[in-house]
Amino acid sequence: MQMNRLDQAFAALADPTRRGIVVHLARGEASVSDLVGLFSLTQPTISSHLKVLESSGLISRSRVAQSRPCKLETQQLKAVTDWLERVQELWEGNFKRLDALLAELKQAQKEERKK
């Protein structure tokens, strides 16, 4: 995934309403009117949030008669998750090295006290 796309996804997810929309869409498709009722926001406000989510690739909207159901795009969400997991692995590696260093220092202190 290009970094620009990742940046767009994180920017989209920075807003609590958009995160709420993503959580709701994880349960299944929803129309704009469904989301308006759920979040007690105006239709233009919800549409604005959906536009940001759609441009980031996190959701897609189709046209069914007069409705435009929204659905979560799991591929883009997986790319975000994969990036976070890589960062988590780096941090866990740092913590493991720190734990090993602390264990070494404790052992050295014990040996020093015995002298």
Q: What do these predicted regions represent?
A:
Residues 47, 63-69:
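Short, Lys/Arg-rich nucleic-acid/phosphate-binding segment
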Residues 1-5, 24-38, 43, 52-56, ...:
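C-terminal regulatory/oligomerization modules of transcriptional regulators
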Residues 12-17:
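Short helix-coil-helix linker/hinge
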Residues 19-21:
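Pre-recognition alpha-helix immediately N-terminal to the DNA-recognition helix
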